[in-house]
Amino acid sequence: AGEFKVSFIRVTHSIPDSFGICVDTKEGRIVTTGDFKIDLTPVGPEMEIHKMSKIGVEGVDLLLADSTNAEKDGWTPSEKNVVDSINEIFDKASGRLIISTFSSNISRIQQLSIIEKSLLLEEV
């Protein structure tokens, strides 16, 4: 019990409006990132990297971080690059395309819809 302060840090993820949380208590600071991907050219809003960095410089007593494939070397391409590749596949396709994606990847589903609509408009 007692007073505490909560602040939110925008993170990039396939789920829109994802945030990390910073909790300041009299006992110390706890930060949980939620699942995130550092994407410098995201389809949606940018990650608040400077805010996350400032919190880190000020000091964190407990960090709970989650990032899929964080243990693998390298980095994951930006969602913008993925969309460009999908657009290229659509342009080259001469027949039916079957597309699979995570149901939680709302931005990808939205981008597929935008590409599809633009192709339908080109046919008219």
Residue ranges and their predicted role:
Residues 1-124:
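His/Asp/Glu-rich metal-coordinating catalytic cores
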